[in-house]
Amino acid sequence: TGYSKSGIVMNSNFTLDSGGYFQFGKITVVNMRVTNKNAVVSNGPVCSGLPKPLREADGKNVVVVVSSYDRVQGVLYQSGESQAGVLNLYYMYTETGNLPAGTTQRLLAVYLAE
């Protein structure tokens, strides 16, 4: 999965849908689709709140760079209750099992996927 070199550093809440992953050093780069539509998923709510820099990317694939607890093997969901720049993980597979709801990871950057 490629990504644009012009990174979009996030400082606000936003909504992410499911996506794939790949490992990049000690961080996990998650390829996800951005949406600003309200939705309900099986593992928890996905709330709207897309910041201005990514509104034009609605429905498109982006690459999300987060600090890594472990390699992401499932999907990330972000809560509307999340603090700025932090992902609230409702559901996440890792090599050592599922991380519990409410687990957070620091969001580093978001890129438009190539």
Walk through the language-model features, giving the residues of each:
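Extracellular receptor-binding modules and their adjoining Ser/Thr/Gly/Asp/Asn-rich linkers
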Residues: 1-42, 46
